[in-house]
């Protein structure tokens, strides 16, 4: 195949390690499926933890038992979310680098998706910081603020899915 045909077809542009031969194997499909499962599981935690924060912000100061129960739930969920985040990111990195998904000309959607992932990592970190503040006895924001905060991962998921499926640029 001549070089001009390779350049015009983003799926064939890479050589060597990013060879198109590695792109569409059954193994890659398993990696992709596991990536989706771990992403969905991580997002479930990103959706639910701020709901626990809403309840923590609304709990009465004299309800020590309820506060401790909610804190225990939040702590366990945050740990579980972090464990799910690691393989989600690792498998995504594998798909991106080893299989060359999103590499090459005309793949600006991948740069935008990676920015979305960085923002999600920041959101995850902020959730951990808010949890520590609750554990220290501080109520950093109102329950209304946490209801709005809860919508952030929904918007980020919407952006990521549109970028991956539609590939607008």
Residue ranges of predicted features:
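Generic detector of N-terminal low-structure segments
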Residues: 19-23
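Polytopic transmembrane helical bundles with strong interfacial aromatic enrichment
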Residues: 24-169
